[in-house]
Amino acid sequence: MGNQFKTLALLAALSGLLIAISYWVIGGSSGLIIGIGLAAVTNLLSWYQSDKIALAVYRAQPVSESQAPRLYRMVQRLSQRANIPMPGVYIVPGQTANAFATGRDPEHAAVAVTEGILNILPEDELEAVIAHELTHIINRDTLTQAVAATVAGAISFLAQMVSYSLWFGGIGGRDNERGGNPLGVLLTVVLAPIAATIIQLAISRTREFSADAGSARLTGNPRALARALQRLEAAARQIPLNANPAFEPLLIINSISGQFLGNLFSSHPSTEARVQALLKLEKQLPTIA
């Protein structure tokens, strides 16, 4: 229920923000009508298509057992162990090392890994990463994360459109009730990206700790995930995954780490904190497994 409530709250926040932006930028009743229409379309899109959007953003390609036997069989084996339907299996092209899961429920889920992660992680560490992503699916985190990413992406996109329009004759008609509000335009361009970041931060960082713990329980090997996280953080510094920042929270690890502002506004806890939590969990595992 907590995830469902948070998802609904995010959708409501998006609706209110889009309507407010339309009102201040376009003006009057026209702005309200356009805002309501945009809110309705975006809500439906984020609810039903957010997984497809996430996969498209990262250019993830579906793979079969014959195309990626090692990965496919690993996802299949862990899904059976977790007693969930097997999600779709995807590979993201490129040598950056990362992974994510998406989908509104276990029946409509997907797990995606990069080519880079397949190249650098040994068997036990890759298994721990897959188990982490499956735990997100089990906990229904994937719905909340995907919707939040779509919401934040929509806000950022709208801010960019408003910014571009300033270079091409302005926005808002002269025949509406308010004629467009210059202050509203400025606030949209400046504050909308910040609002997108706040929405990302609304997704609790404890979700990552929970997924880490779920991986440890599923594999019985918390130290493998700890090693994988350290390896992935080092790899991300060398080859970051370039994509819309709104979809950063879907990844198992921040694609760009070690920067003050990046850590301050990160939707992930620090890798050091996650590793320490896993090492503590290792001592407790026989009693909680």
Curated annotation (Swiss-Prot):
It is an enzyme of class 3 (hydrolase). This is Protease HtpX homolog. The chain crosses the membrane at residues 8-28, 29-49, 151-171, 183-203. Binds 1 zinc ion per subunit. It comes from Trichormus variabilis (strain ATCC 29413 / PCC 7937). Belongs to the peptidase M48B family. It is a multi-pass membrane protein. The keyword Membrane applies. Its cofactor is Zn(2+). It is found in: Cell inner membrane. One of its GO terms (molecular function) is metalloendopeptidase activity. Keywords: Cell inner membrane, Cell membrane, Hydrolase, Membrane, Metal-binding, Metalloprotease, Protease, Transmembrane, Transmembrane helix, Zinc. One of its GO terms (cellular component) is plasma membrane. Zn(2+) binds at H132, H136, E208. The gene is htpX. Pfam families: Peptidase_M48. One of its GO terms (biological process) is proteolysis. The keyword Heme does not apply. PROSITE patterns: ZINC_PROTEASE (PS00142). Coiled coil: none annotated.
